[in-house]
From Swiss-Prot:
Bias kind Low complexity: ranges: 84-119
A Pfam family of this chain: Exo_endo_phos
Reactions catalysed according to its record: a sphingomyelin + H2O = phosphocholine + an N-acylsphing-4-enine + H(+)
Signal sequence, start to end: 1-37
Source species: Leptospira interrogans serogroup Icterohaemorrhagiae serovar Lai (strain 56601)
InterPro entries the record matches: Endo/exonu/phosph_ase_sf, Endo/exonuclease/phosphatase, Sph/SMPD2-like, Sphingomyelinase/PLipase_C
Enzyme class (EC, first level): hydrolase
GO cellular component: extracellular region
Protein name, as recorded: Sphingomyelinase C 1
Record-linked PANTHER family: SPHINGOMYELINASE C 1, SPHINGOMYELINASE FAMILY MEMBER
Gene: sph1
Length: 597
């Protein structure tokens, strides 16, 4: 039954009469103000009118305060009945079937003028990077160069000029200390790593335990004050290697210039063969945990909520679209390199996931139920370290991680990467024999197949990456004669080496996984820096007879066009090659970026 509250009608009518009188007076005053503005000596008249208008306006404000539902707790009820309250709420919300609202809520574009765009008016720049720093006590990983890579990440340029950084996969204690301490001056506000301790958190939720061998590896650092820190431990990470980790997510509330940003950083269940089909199910449960947590926080609609991290969900898959729906987030505008785990360009990824195809797994997403920026871009970037690092077994690399980082931002600016960072001067070079004018190439069918100078056409198999491991600079502008590691550009981590059983006991050359010839060298016959068109020869050490010999293109029989270690002194056309640098420019996505105009 609809009932009315017992309010004297005279009071209600008087209130509307007062409002009517005020509006009439204001209208008359403004008309008089307009007329007097055209007359001399108008200043005093105008000031008097403005004072009157201000008084009327303040009076109206006071009347509103007096009528506020917060003035008297006993009267903190709407004048309409409960049913009309619900009806009003529904009337104010756009309906899917309402012809005045042509867009459905799920397709509503990001709108800078929407009431939910308050905190988005102040831009936020956030970086997410899964840095593959597993603890050494897990035997399946061991030495990954964690501490050396931490040093290089801390001093790198790709982590500069951000508001927030979310690191995932940072479970190595010493590497964590090195990295966080070195970046503290730029990012002074830091969380603890998820899952190690309850100290330093405002709250610890979920299935926290002290028994796992490793923490959850997620850390958030910020240029701006962190007002709240919560860690949540998943209770369903029980598949494969993840069962040994306290995996979960970190939540922080950040205050940037008075505006609040809410960030969740996480690393979901890994994609492991040991998990069979259960990995996707576990990730769904973990996404449910994240969404339930966000809902429980009752975050104001005009504040931005970001969900970021190594989500281990392949972009474009059914699982990906389920994630977008479950989290109720907008798809970002994707720019940059096409994959974040790229086994074709990232040697560290290729080393540990040799059989995997390149995939995109890392995201920075914006909740649709909260403040919306005018646009939201995710840029996957492929930087390399300026200096190389070495593992204890001698493996040398310039990769920061097996994953590429992702930037999240509204508009690009002068600090936004616009080109691939993975293009080195002496990558994807080719060698053309001066004897038969053919290019050296790796085997098309076998990663560890023979090297042969047998094609006149440049292909992916004729390209090789050069690295001088005794030179710390990863991308030198000048490479001179000397010791060199030659890697197939197509088969990453497969290096030139010899097999002494080829052709009745001779040194035949092929590409071998993670094992290049220690004594292989390159000689620039034109002297100076290696450049496009340089004439070069390759030499190596004879481990049986002793002494250095040059590699030659065999010219007869069943081993014709194979490479052998053969000539010691005199160089003929069979031992001389033209070096061709790769003339292709690095991938450029500057035209795909959106800048503020």
């Amino acid at each position: 039954m609809i009932t009315k509250r017992n309010i004297p009608p005279c009071k209600k009518n008087w209130k509307y009469k007062k409002k009517s009188i005020s509006l009439t007076l204001i209208t008359i005053c403004y008309m008089f103000l307009f007329l007097t503005s055209c007359k001399p000596g108008k200043k005093n008249s105008i000031n008097l009118l403005l004072l009157l208008l201000n008084t009327l306006d303040n009076k109206n404000v006071n009347e509103k305060i007096e009528d506020s539902t917060n003035t008297d707790p006993s009267s903190n009820v709407n004048e309409e009945d409960e049913n009309s309250i619900n009806a009003n709420a529904n009337d104010n919300a756009p309906s899917d079937s309402d012809s005045s609202n042509p867009r459905s809520p799920d397709k509503n574009p990001v709108n800078p003028t929407s009431p939910n765009s308050s905190s988005a008016d102040i831009g936020i720049k956030i970086l997410s990077h899964s840095i593959f720093m597993a603890p050494t006590n897990l035997s399946s990983w061991g030495d990954l160069g964690q501490e050396e890579r931490a040093q290089r990440i801390a001093s790198s340029s790709y982590i500069k000029n951000q508001d927030i950084i979310v690191f995932e996969g940072l479970s190595h204690n010493n590497a964590e200390k090195i990295l966080l301490e070195k970046i503290r001056s730029e990012y002074p506000y830091q969380t603890n790593v998820v899952g190690r301790t309850k100290k330093g958190w405002n709250a610890t939720l979920g299935a926290y335990t002290t028994s796992p061998m490793a923490n959850g590896g997620v850390i958030i650092v910020s240029k701006w004050p962190i007002e709240e820190k919560v860690q949540y431990i998943f209770n369903n990470s029980n598949c494969g290697q993840d069962q040994y980790y306290n995996k979960g997510f970190a939540y922080v509330k950040i205050n940037k210039d008075g505006k609040k940003f809410h960030v969740i950083g996480t690393q979901l269940q890994a994609r492991e063969p040991d998990c069979f089909n259960s990995g996707e199910t576990i990730r769904k449960l973990q996404l449910n945990d994240i969404k339930s947590f966000i809902d429980s926080k009752d975050i104001p609609k005009d504040e931005t909520v970001l969900i970021t991290g190594d989500l281990n969900i392949i972009k474009g898959s059914n699982e990906y679209f389920d994630m977008i729906s479950k989290l109720n987030v907008n798809e970002p505008r994707y720019v940059g390199v096409p994959f974040t785990l790229d086994t074709k360009t990232n040697a560290l990824a290729a080393y540990y996931y040799e059989k995997e195809k390149p995939i995109y797994l890392d995201y920075i997403l914006v909740s649709k139920l909260h403040a919306q920026p005018p646009v939201w871009q995710n840029l996957a970037y492929d930087p390399i370290s300026n200096t190389t690092w070495k593992r204890s077994d001698g493996y040398t690399s310039y990769e920061f991680s097996d994953r590429y980082p992702v930037y999240g931002f509204i508009y690009a600016d002068s600090s936004t990467p616009t080109k691939s960072g993975h293009k080195r001067k002496y990558d994807q070079v080719s060698f053309q024999s001066t004897f038969n004018r053919k290019f050296i190439q790796a085997d098309h069918n076998k990663k560890d197949g023979w090297l042969k100078a047998d094609t006149r056409i440049k292909t992916d198999f004729t390209k090789f990456n050069l690295l001088q491991e005794n030179v710390s600079e990863s991308n030198p502008s000048c490479m001179n004669s000397g010791s060199v590691r030659i890697e197939s550009s197509y088969y990453l981590n497969y290096y030139w080496n010899w097999f002494i059983g080829a052709a009745s006991g001779d040194y035949g050359y092929y590409t071998k996984f993670n094992n290049g010839s220690d004594s292989l060298g390159i000689k620039n016959l034109d002297n100076g820096c290696l450049k496009d068109g340089s004439r070069v020869a390759f030499y190596d050490w004879d481990t049986i007879g002793g002494g250095y010999y040059y590699l030659t293109v065999w010219d007869k029989g069943s081993w014709k066009e194979h490479l052998f270690l053969w000539v010691q002194s005199f160089l003929s056309s069979r031992e001389i090659f033209y070096l061709h640098l790769d003339s292709n420019p690095p991938k450029d996505w500057s035209k795909d970026l959106i800048y503020h105009h």
